[in-house]
């Protein structure tokens, strides 16, 4: 009796999900049950639920088959897990690559914007420098013009004083003679010009030159007659 393996009839029962069968307290999937029935020497394959599995199956044989099927199921799950892990790694790699490309694009855009800002800043600095130079030149020209106007005014003043002095000398020397102002027309024109151009006396320089020539000629003529 000890050398004979014990046998018993095994019953398959479907649970509420209709795709899981309980074998001696072990929950097996429908795929596992189908494969066990395919290798079983008993009964048609269509017998699935609420039936008897085989005529007699020993505990050792049942355990072996269940262990094999469970090992296959575990290997299948591990294979699927490996596939999912591989897909997850590939997806992570693609995401990392996309993020790297996006980061590079953002950096290039920032560099481009910084270069544009640097160019604009440099151009603004150049314009400021040009404006400073122009203002400096304008101030220089205004200063030179003011000096010329001042010199012209002084020249006219000195010339007028010299003329008055010469006229007084001539008048004192020739009191008996009646005389008329020399170059009176030009003198009147010059006086009117300076009144009208108090801020731009340089514009009267042409009249002043004519007046000086006229005065010198009159003076020379008077001296020659007196000599």
Swiss-Prot record:
InterPro entries: MIC19/MIC25, MICOS_subunit_Mic19. It is a lipid-anchor. Coiled coil: none annotated. It comes from Bos taurus. Disulfide bonds join 183-214, 193-204. It holds the Pfam family MIC19_MIC25. The gene is CHCHD3. This is MICOS complex subunit MIC19. Component of the mitochondrial contact site and cristae organizing system (MICOS) complex, composed of at least MICOS10/MIC10, CHCHD3/MIC19, CHCHD6/MIC25, APOOL/MIC27, IMMT/MIC60, APOO/MIC23/MIC26 and MICOS13/MIC13. This complex was also known under the names MINOS or MitOS complex. The MICOS complex associates with mitochondrial outer membrane proteins SAMM50, MTX1 and MTX2 (together described as components of the mitochondrial outer membrane sorting assembly machinery (SAM) complex) and DNAJC11, mitochondrial inner membrane protein TMEM11 and with HSPA9.
């Amino acid at each position: 009796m000890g050398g004979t393996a014990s046998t018993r009839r095994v019953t398959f029962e479907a649970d509420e999900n209709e795709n899981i069968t309980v074998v001696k307290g072990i929950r097996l999937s429908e795929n596992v049950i189908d494969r066990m029935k395919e290798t079983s020497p008993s009964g048609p394959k269509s017998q699935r639920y609420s039936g008897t599995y085989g005529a007699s199956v020993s505990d050792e044989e049942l355990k072996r088959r269940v262990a094999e099927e469970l090992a296959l199921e575990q290997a299948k799950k591990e294979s699927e897990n490996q596939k999912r892990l591989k897909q997850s790694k590939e997806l992570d790699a693609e995401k990392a690559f996309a993020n790297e490309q996006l980061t590079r694009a953002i950096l290039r855009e920032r560099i481009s914007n910084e270069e544009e800002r640097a160019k604009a800043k440099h151009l603004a600095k150049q314009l400021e420098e040009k404006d400073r130079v122009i203002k400096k030149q304008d101030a220089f020209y205004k200063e030179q013009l003011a000096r010329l106007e001042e010199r012209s005014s002084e020249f006219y003043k000195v010339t007028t004083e010299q003329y008055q002095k010469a006229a007084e000398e001539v008048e004192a020397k020739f009191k008996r003679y009646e005389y008329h102002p020399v170059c009176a027309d030009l003198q009147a024109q010059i006086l009117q010009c300076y009144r009208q151009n108090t801020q731009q006396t340089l514009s009267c320089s042409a009249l002043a030159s004519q007046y000086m020539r006229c005065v010198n000629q009159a003076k020379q003529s008077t001296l020659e007659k007196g000599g």
